[in-house]
């Protein structure tokens, strides 16, 4: 599908404009009335399999040791356990240690009294796109009134940043993207982010789930890329 058919650049072909196609007008330009303009980038799924075979990959799906991205080919690992040895964070046998002493992503971790679980997260950037900005852990739980809640924690920050202990947010790394060219900051951000983390709001009587979100520095949306490549202004009614 071309950028015109996706609705990301204006229709200029007289024959197409004279056809019975449905158009929408934005800033004096006519665009194809296409639902594609609201879609996100093609997503990808990744699994941690012992080997590149059908059986091994499906085994990884079954145990839910898997993750998804909105397009970038980054990789993410996530483990949970008790009394994990944080001094091993840079050891060569770190992953082997975690598989032996923790639960992998997608697994259930049973409570042990009032003991606070430890988490380990490791994200590695896609080398063909922007560096990493931060890694978050999102906690979901049911409060005392029976209402579902979610809380977001920044747990690892790029460029030496440390999460604020009160807001649980990383400082901004001031990465930029030039909407006119789609050039983005290449000298800010991290190639990888990894950390051990404990939930500061943990309650032993509370059932909860945790998942990881790795964020890149800002980049252009696909529709903005279409506009830049075709030397036209991006649509004003769409995110950039």
Could you describe each region identified by the protein language model?
Residues 1-240:
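C-terminal functional module detector
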């Amino acid at each position: 599908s071309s950028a015109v058919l996706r609705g990301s650049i204006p229709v200029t072909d007289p024959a197409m404009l004279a056809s019975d196609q449905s158009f929408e007008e934005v800033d004096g330009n006519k665009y194809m009335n296409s639902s594609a303009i609201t879609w996100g980038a093609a997503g990808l799924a990744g699994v941690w399999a012992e080997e590149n075979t059908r059986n091994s990959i499906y085994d990884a799906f079954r145990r839910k040791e898997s993750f998804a991205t909105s397009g970038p080919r980054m990789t993410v690992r996530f483990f949970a356990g008790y009394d994990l040895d944080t001094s091993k964070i840079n050891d060569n046998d770190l992953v082997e240690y975690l598989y032996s002493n923790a639960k992998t992503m997608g697994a259930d971790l049973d409570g042990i009294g009032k003991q606070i679980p430890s988490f380990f997260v490791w994200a590695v950037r896609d080398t063909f796109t922007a560096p990493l900005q931060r890694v978050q852990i999102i906690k979901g739980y049911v409060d005392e009134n029976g209402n579902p809640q979610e809380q977001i924690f920044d747990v690892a920050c790029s460029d030496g940043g440390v999460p604020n202990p009160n807001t649980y947010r990383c400082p901004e790394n001031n990465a930029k993207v030039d909407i006119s060219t789609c050039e983005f900051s290449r000298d800010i951000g991290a190639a990888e982010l990894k950390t051990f983390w404990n939930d500061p709001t943990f309650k032993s009587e509370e059932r909860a789930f945790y998942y990881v979100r790795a964020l890149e520095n800002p980049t252009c949306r696909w529709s903005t890329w279409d506009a830049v490549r075709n030397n036209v202004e991006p649509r004003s009614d769409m995110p950039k």
